Curated annotation (Swiss-Prot):
EC number: 2.3.1.234
Similarity section: Belongs to the KAE1 / TsaD family.
NCBIfam families the UniProt entry points to: gcp_kae1, T6A_TsaD_YgjD
Name this protein carries in UniProt: tRNA N6-adenosine threonylcarbamoyltransferase
Catalysed transformations (reactions): L-threonylcarbamoyladenylate + adenosine(37) in tRNA = N(6)-L-threonylcarbamoyladenosine(37) in tRNA + AMP + H(+)
Entry's cofactor comment: Binds 1 Fe(2+) ion per subunit.
GO CC list: cytoplasm
Database matches in SUPFAM superfamilies: Actin-like ATPase domain (SSF53067)
InterPro entries the UniProt entry points to: ATPase_NBD (IPR043129), Gcp-like_dom (IPR000905), KAE1/TsaD (IPR017861), TsaD (IPR022450)
Gene this chain is encoded by: tsaD
UniProt xrefs under CDD domains: ASKHA_NBD_TsaD_bac
Reported cofactor(s): Fe(2+)
Cell compartments where the protein resides: Cytoplasm
Top-level taxonomy: Bacteria, Pseudomonadati, Pseudomonadota, Betaproteobacteria, Rhodocyclales
Length: 343
């Protein structure tokens, strides 16, 4: 069962083929729109949609060339149906449904966050259900209890800014370019944490929710003060990163203790953050917990995770008739996702 995956939820265009019969990713191609949006300091939805339209046929041709496969080899198409930018989602969904109709194969709308959540299972030493998942990206910060494919319970989430969003906004406050998160992390690596006393929002709230807007405001107050020196930006970046990482780690480990589980899956763009991985690994090792991540290349948005999620759903009994019905949900809570086989 070879599944073609298509990802266009924001500013990355991704295509991939996963073969469920041999449980192997056969190939994936990805195009980032960073250069396209850099001049604007953020993603411009209209430009993102147009670029997806241009790139999808080219990437698919490249993917078929690299894998030696063709349209006739594809058994199903999985595409990101939400959440994300409406126009960007529609480009991928339309392309996927048209391909599926022409090839006479089923098309499966996939939840973007489910793709991230399941991506660590692509590893050779994949975690087994059940586990706790920490989803950390530009748009979402959530802790989930994962009992199986499509069986998700929300334990806690950000009440305002997501962790990745806080990274991006703080990067702008420090005068860094786009994309802000990776640039802030790079700057933090040059600094020394401990100079600035920044808050750890909701660290002791007794639940699994997050809040990062107050931390961002603390940085704004610091850089707006009369005694601020730009030469201290690296130290401030390091302290900001430490504050976010400390809260993420504390909540994630508390969720493991609360559920009685011993495996944590970390997914989403912020999951590639080196300091987060370092601290989580150290803390988890002391408690004999296991922490699993996707490989760094699969932390950002990509088609591989969508193809894989589609393959798992088909394996679990999900069936979709090939039809030119484009289904997208720009706002789509993960807990509203049906388990495979549900009507």
């Amino acid at each position: 069962m070879k599944v073609l995956g298509i990802e266009t939820s924001c500013d990355e265009t991704g295509v991939a083929i996963y073969d469920g019969s041999v449980r192997r990713l056969l190939g994936h191609c990805l195009h980032s729109q960073i250069d396209l949006h850099a001049a604007y300091g953020g993603v411009v939805p209209e430009l993102a949609s147009r670029d997806h339209i241009r790139r999808l046929p080219l990437l698919l041709k490249q993917l078929f060339g690299e894998t030696g496969l063709s349209r006739r080899d594809i058994d199903a198409v999985a595409y990101t149906a939400g959440p994300g930018l409406a126009g960007a989602l529609l480009t991928g969904a339309s392309f996927a449904e048209a391909f599926a109709l022409a090839a006479g194969v089923p098309a499966l709308p996939i939840h973007h966050l489910e793709g991230h959540l399941l991506s660590p299972l692509l590893a050779d030493d994949a975690p087994r259900f059940p586990f706790v998942a920490l989803l950390v990206s530009g748009g979402h910060t959530q802790l989930m209890h994962v009992a199986g494919v499509g069986r998700y319970e929300l334990l806690g989430e950000s009440l305002d800014d997501a962790a990745g969003e806080a990274f991006d906004k703080t990067a702008k406050l420090l005068g860094l370019g786009y994309p802000g998160g990776p640039q802030l992390s790079a700057l933090a690596a040059q600094g020394c944490a401990g100079r600035f006393k920044l808050p750890r929002p909701m660290l002791h709230s007794g639940d699994f929710d997050f809040s990062f807007s107050g931390l961002k405001t603390a940085v704004l107050n610091r850089v707006s003060s009369d005694d601020w020196e730009p030469g201290l930006a690296a130290d401030l970046a390091a302290d900001f990163q430490e504050a976010v990482v400390e809260v993420l780690c504390a909540k994630a480990l508390a969720a493991l203790k609360h559920t009685g589980l011993d495996t944590l899956v970390v997914a989403g763009g912020v999951g590639a953050n080196r300091r987060l991985r370092e601290r989580l690994d150290n803390l988890a090792a002391r408690r004999r917990y296991r922490v699993c991540y996707p490989e760094p290349a699969l932390c950002t948005d990509n088609g591989a995770m969508i193809a894989f999620a589609g393959a798992l759903r088909l394996e679990a009994g999900e069936r979709r008739a090939a039809a030119p019905a484009v289904r997208v949900r720009p706002r789509w809570p993960l807990v509203e996702l049906d388990a495979p086989g549900c009507p």
